[in-house]
């Protein structure tokens, strides 16, 4: 059963989402050559403290930091460190999640380190793939319609689809049903209902979609070292479509 949120619950998640959006905006100003990923983590930690929220990632199944910082071939779950220093031309995914008054919000964005007019197509295409998926959220449609839309767009642009990680339900827990892969057939599974909250998050690569996990048991990289981008929104189903919460 996929839970239906009350207006009060949605407002709490919306507030958490607003803080995440502000965190992304703040961190984006520090995504420049010479910044360490540990500095980004420290900035996020301080920002969370100032806004009376807690990281959803810190100590989650043992994850050691407050945010995920995934650079270049790192697909997801990159651990911030003083050893990872951003360079001109890098791409970095910042994945944020917070807990606020019993509810979670989660969102991710891939950034280019350098002149934004030179942003690689992979980044803009992955963001577009996310939005293509979200356009499927309307009364009568199925969760698998999101999956099919993302898959179709990625295939049209010859991008690898990482299949090992999926979107997910969210609310009183960070990850819950439904799980929303970025591939599949349309018109299958659960149907959207007003008040459902979940995250959609395509992870696409310039090469192989195959991944491996490094010895830290967290960092996920493409096996062929190709670049990977990742975008994520937390959304709520409305009576006619959807609203982005984070």
Where is each model-derived feature located?
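Active-site neighborhoods and metal-handling regions in enzymes and metal-associated proteins
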Residues: 1-246
């Amino acid at each position: 059963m996929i839970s239906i949120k009350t207006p009060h619950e949605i407002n709490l998640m919306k507030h958490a989402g607003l803080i995440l959006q502000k965190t992304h905006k703040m961190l984006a100003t520090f995504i420049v050559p010479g910044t360490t990923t540990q500095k980004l983590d420290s900035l996020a930690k301080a920002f969370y403290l100032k806004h009376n929220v807690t990281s959803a990632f810190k100590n989650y199944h043992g994850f050691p930091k407050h945010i995920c910082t995934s650079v270049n071939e790192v697909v997801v779950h990159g651990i911030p460190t003083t050893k990872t220093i951003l360079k001109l031309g890098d791409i970095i995914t910042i994945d944020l999640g917070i807990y606020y008054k019993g509810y979670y919000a989660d969102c991710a964005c891939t950034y280019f380190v350098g002149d934004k007019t030179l942003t690689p197509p992979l980044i803009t295409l992955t963001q577009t793939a996310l939005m293509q998926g979200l356009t499927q959220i309307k009364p009568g449609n199925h969760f698998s319609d999101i999956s099919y839309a993302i898959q179709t767009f990625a295939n049209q642009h010859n991008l690898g689809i990482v299949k090992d990680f999926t979107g997910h339900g969210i609310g009183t827990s960070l990850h819950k049903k439904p799980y929303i892969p970025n591939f599949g057939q349309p018109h299958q599974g659960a149907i959207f209902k007003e008040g459902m909250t979940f995250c959609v998050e395509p992870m696409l690569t310039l090469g192989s979609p195959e991944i491996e996990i490094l010895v830290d048991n967290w960092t996920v990289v493409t096996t062929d070292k190709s670049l990977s981008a990742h975008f994520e929104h937390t959304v709520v189903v409305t009576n006619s479509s959807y609203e982005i919460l984070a």
